[in-house]
């Protein structure tokens, strides 16, 4: 979404609705849905007013979610990780999600 193209009152309403929706979706039983929500929340976390609830949700996810893809996605954004580890990841999370959804796995 390009929030900057909205008038300030509309922008705040749209950002709040996006945040509420993604926080709800981040609790979905399907890990693919949760992963997509984490990617969306990471994008929204660039907005200072939305950072606190997003950080709180990420802490909950790291403490409770057992799916490695979800926790790895969130850990990639952590400032405590080694810079070399994060720069080795060249694929964007949304692109990885598309690969997971559309590329059949060979077993």
Swiss-Prot record:
The gene is cpcF. Its EC number is 4.-.-.-. It comes from Mastigocladus laminosus. Belongs to the CpcE/RpcE/PecE family. Keywords: Antenna complex, Lyase, Phycobilisome. The keyword Lyase applies. This is Phycocyanobilin lyase subunit beta. The keyword Chaperone does not apply. GO terms for cellular component: phycobilisome.
